[in-house]
């Protein structure tokens, strides 16, 4: 499976937020730990709603969490 055309900083943001676990983030966003892991690894594209919820948890604008990958 090919990686998605965007990157994210979720893992870094989780670490900076007191080493928040994938499960903790999933609970706050309303998705499973497995979904957070897949998003972090670029294997799953979150819905726009989930992307905004993730950004809100960290108090960041969407473009500071997700960005287009450079070729």
Annotate the PLM regions.
Residues 49-64:
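DNA major-groove recognition helix of helix-turn-helix/homeodomain DNA-binding modules
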Residues 14, 40, 69:
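DNA major-groove recognition helix of helix-turn-helix
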Residues 30-45:
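Recognition helix of helix-turn-helix/homeodomain-like DNA-binding domains
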Residues 9-28:
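Short basic helix-loop element that most often maps to the first helix and adjoining turn
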Residues 1-5:
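A detector for short, charged/polar N-terminal pre-domain segments
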Residues 64-71:
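Short amphipathic recognition helices of helix-turn-helix/homeodomain-type DNA-binding modules
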Residues 23, 34, 63:
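Residues within helix-turn-helix
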């Amino acid at each position: 499976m090919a990686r998605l055309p965007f990157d994210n900083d979720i893992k870094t943001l989780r670490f900076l937020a007191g080493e928040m676990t994938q499960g903790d983030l999933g609970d706050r966003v309303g998705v499973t730990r497995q979904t957070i892991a897949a998003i972090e690894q670029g294997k799953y594209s979150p819905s726009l709603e989930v992307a905004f919820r993730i950004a809100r948890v960290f108090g960041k604008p969407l473009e500071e969490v997700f960005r287009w990958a450079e070729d």
